[in-house]
Design a protein with these regions (language model features):
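Conserved catalytic-core helix/loop/strand module for nucleotide-ribose chemistry
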Residues: 1-152
Length: 152
């Protein structure tokens, strides 16, 4: 019996539906989103590469993100690139990581989830969106899952 047949049998024999556990590989595969370190690298605009922050943090990614966020905070307030975002979001600033979080959210909101349909994944995406699941558990920030499963 193949794994597909085995899983199908298990799911058919259960009264409750399945939960999907979705990780970052999902967004990387279907919409080309960077890894966490790749996403942080995208916002290294202050003259220091991501490797500088990673090295300063002794390889600890959350600490590297905090160091980057501190530098980005200062950059965000003074950069013409972000002047419109500053006007729109300055009331949301709660700490030195807020500016980076805002701009990551802005970047993710601009991603086109329909790209997954154009990149050879149409059949997979359509199959996934037709699943009847009881819930989805994820830490992903992008909106691709919301598009696939609008009722959750």
């Amino acid at each position: 019996m193949t794994i597909e047949h085995h899983l199908t049998k298990i799911l058919k024999d259960r009264a409750a539906g399945a939960f999907l556990f979705i990780g970052s590989g999902f967004s990387r595969r279907y919409i080309g989103l960077e890894s966490w370190e790749g996403l942080l690298s995208r916002f290294c605009e202050m003259g220091k590469p991501y490797e500088f922050y990673r090295g300063s943090a002794d390889g600890n990614t959350p600490v590297a993100a905090k160091l980057l966020a501190n530098d980005f905070h200062n950059h965000w307030w003074g950069s013409p690139t972000y002047s419109e975002s500053v006007k729109l979001n300055k009331d949301k600033i709660k700490d030195s990581s807020s500016a980076l979080r805002i701009e990551i959210c802005n970047y993710l909101a601009k991603l086109d989830p329909s790209a997954a349909l154009n990149d050879g994944y149409r059949e997979e995406v359509e199959l996934l969106s037709s699943l009847n699941v009881d819930g989805i558990i994820t830490t992903n920030w992008d909106l691709f899952l919301e598009e696939l499963f609008p009722d959750y």
